[in-house]
Amino acid sequence: MDIRNRRALRREADAAVAANTGDPRLTLVVYVAVSLLGALAIAILRTILGNRIATTGGLQNLGLQAILTTIQTAAPLIWAIAMMGLDLGRQSVCLNMVRRRSVEPRSLLAGFPKLGGLIRAGFLQGALYLLIMILAVNVGSIIFMATPLARDLYAIVADLALNSEALYEALYNDPEFLNQVFSAMLPIYPIVAVLFLIVAIPVFYRYRMVNYCLLDQPRNSALVAMGESISMTKGSRWALVKLDLSFWWFYLGLALCGVVMYGDVILETLGVALPWNTTVSYYVFYVAALVMEGVLYYFSLNHIQTTYAAAYEALRPKLQPAPTGGVVLGNIFDLAKGQKDQ
């Protein structure tokens, strides 16, 4: 299969879902329900803990406040890590469907055994993006200061440029002066953003298949999986970009869900008052966004993610057969059961 033939990839994805002997629709419903209801539960927990912290005062309750604050901070992080494993399991489900293997809801657990490798790969990629951002900020600052874009900034700090103590004093103690400096530096932000994207987008597509490599070869390290992704996507990264762009409607839908989720903040910014308190407003828009996201996932996620799995199959070296011992096996539980029966 040719990665550049997006229609063929989509047809393969639809055929894989339709031909699956398991229950791909129920598996999708379980994934959507767990991910969205879990997010809602975490939001409710944070609200309850926040109210409890606000009403817990006094020196004698400092220990309780510390515990509640720790739980409030740690709960979203723990949930995010759990969702990484669930999302990886979801990718393994789609890869199984492309390989004509039966899937069922428990197949979603297949990503958790490789969660450590996924976290390490994410950390390495995050460190790389941070380095790119640091370079973009430094280069962008040089470009900004060396062009006429910085003339307003020079005019503002001209009188204080030779007196570092006075300059620091003005920056720390004069809010109006600080606002003028920030306003004069506004052109630097698009410069840095463009420089970052120029480098970060190609890097992103170099590592686009890391998750699938981790699933296929669970014993490989994160670095090995990243290297495999680089080799696999070489010469096909533009095809992956066009594949992403072909799903513009899906990503636009996700963006719309994000706008709705922050509808209370947007309306407040516009000066629109709602007939209930801020907590109710938050949850009205939050639940509405989750419902929209659930509908979008239900009708499109199987097709989209299985198409990406088909793209991985098209890029995977054909001389190397698909492994039979990887985490990607949705029927890993069936294999374990068979060994137990023996």
Segments (PLM) and residue ranges:
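Hydrophobic alpha-helical membrane segments
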Residues: 1-342
